[in-house]
Amino acid sequence: MIDTIMLDAQERMSKCVDATKNQMAKVRTGRAHPSLLDSIQVSCYGSMSPLKQVANVGVEDSRTLTVNVFDRSMVQAVEKAIMSSDLGLNPMSAGATLRIPLPSLTEERRKDFIKVVRNEAENGRIAIRNVRRDAISEVKKLEKAKACTEDDVRRSEDEVQKHTDSSIKNIDQILAAKEKELMEV
């Protein structure tokens, strides 16, 4: 019973780390990356679709993204969707391909992004601590129900704490890498 609680806690903590990593990946750095356009929705054939479904996004160089639209008639809609997004990008059309030069980040903008990234990291840490709290309370319920001994409870608390420390360390490493990436000019 305790083993399933520990496995569940470990799994939930790794999901928290992954979710935090994904949230941080959405924060734009000075470098071109296809995931920058993941959140863009395009109006096509009367409904909204993710950009991935109507075009292929690639990286031309460190400061330029290319968007190859599958259907030439959709180029205008894709261009409009990119321009109306809050990313501040201005695509240039070349047939069925859009080139999107990424403007370099100002020092002030970089610091704003670092604040956002630190906030995401803190949210990840909080989620991990909540998982720890839940796991420990589950184990204590087992102890009250006389399903395990006090030694088992202490052992499992130590194990949960080790997983918590490890997960928070992973988030801190991801944060440090992202901050370094943001501060590169």
UniProtKB/Swiss-Prot annotation:
GO terms assigned for molecular function: ribosomal large subunit binding
Major place of residence: cytoplasm
One Pfam family here: RRF
Domain of life of the source: Bacteria
Keywords for the protein's UniProt record, in alphabetical order: Cytoplasm, Protein biosynthesis
Disulfide-bonded cysteines: none
Residues making up the signal peptide according to the UniProt record: none
Localization per Swiss-Prot or TrEMBL: Cytoplasm
Family matches, as Gene3D superfamilies: 3.30.1360.40, Ribosome-recycling factor
A GO-annotated cellular component: cytosol
GO BP terms in the entry: cytoplasmic translational termination
InterPro entries: Ribosome_recyc_fac, Ribosome_recyc_fac_dom, RRF_sf
Function, as annotated: Responsible for the release of ribosomes from messenger RNA at the termination of protein biosynthesis. May increase the efficiency of translation by recycling ribosomes from one round of translation to another.
Family to which the UniProt record says this protein belongs: Belongs to the RRF family.
Protein name: Ribosome-recycling factor
Top-level taxonomy: Bacteria, Pseudomonadati, Pseudomonadota, Gammaproteobacteria, Alteromonadales
